[in-house]
């Protein structure tokens, strides 16, 4: 089930909306929060202050849907402002890091409905923490898909068009586009500066570590 149809008063829950960029995550988050406001529930909305693309005091979708929000520097700041809320919305959850997990759990245990939207994969198509862990503890999960700009297929990956250092580079269409699995891989292979495509879950080889250990022992003997 992706969204609760009915919950008992005081029953907390966690809802997670994940997908690539341009897949409608923020639009879906705004839709749920507006429905809660129409139902006259007390709503508090948060986003990380690193997300300054469109507005400092609002969550804004790529299609310009917006709803007022509060910017926070770290996940723990949410607890200071959410005490009276019945429904809590959090956009761009991946930017708040693993510290978001205990915050969300605490809010749900307090009987609050918590809705988190964010990227489940980074620009290399690797799991973007803490979203995979949030998926594991959520009662309700929604996976949104974009449209591949290359072939028009359903897209679940975010392709970085320009070479920038670092995992987190905040930007819009000038930097990122949605791609399907095939077109994402083709783009990565065609980029001379891109990291090699491999198994994101592969464990690092033990051989380099063994060589370093042997070299260290030899230095101590000398």
Residue ranges and their predicted role:
Residues 2-83, 122-133, 146, 162-164, ...:
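Conserved P-loop
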Residues 92-107, 121-128:
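Conserved ATPase-coupling elements of RecA-like P-loop NTPase cores
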Residues 12, 39-41, 110-112, 137-140:
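Short glycine-/polar-rich loops that comprise or flank the Walker A/P-loop
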Residues 140-149:
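Conserved AAA+ ATPase "SRH/arginine-finger" region at the nucleotide-binding site
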């Amino acid at each position: 089930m992706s969204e609760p149809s009915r919950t008992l008063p005081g029953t907390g829950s966690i809802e997670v909306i994940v997908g690539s960029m341009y897949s409608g995550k923020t639009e879906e988050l705004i839709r749920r929060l507006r429905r809660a406001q129409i139902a006259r529930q007390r709503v508090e909305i948060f986003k990380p202050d690193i997300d300054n693309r469109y507005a400092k005091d609002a969550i804004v979708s790529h299609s310009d849907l917006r709803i007022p929000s509060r910017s926070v520097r770290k996940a723990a700041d949410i607890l200071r402002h959410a005490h009276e809320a019945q429904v809590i919305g959090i956009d761009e959850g991946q930017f708040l890091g693993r510290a978001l997990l205990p915050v969300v759990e605490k809010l749900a245990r307090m009987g609050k409905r918590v809705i988190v939207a964010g990227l489940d994969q980074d620009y290399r198509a690797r799991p973007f923490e803490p979203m995979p862990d949030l998926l594991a503890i959520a009662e309700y999960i929604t996976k949104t898909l974009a449209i591949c700009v290359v072939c028009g297929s359903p897209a679940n990956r975010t392709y970085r068009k320009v070479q920038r250092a670092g995992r987190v580079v905040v930007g819009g269409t000038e930097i990122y586009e949605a791609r399907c699995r095939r077109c994402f891989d083709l783009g990565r292979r065609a980029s001379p500066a891109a990291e090699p495509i491999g198994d994101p879950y592969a464990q690092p080889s033990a051989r380099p570590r063994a060589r370093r250990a042997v070299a260290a022992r030899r230095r101590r003997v000398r």
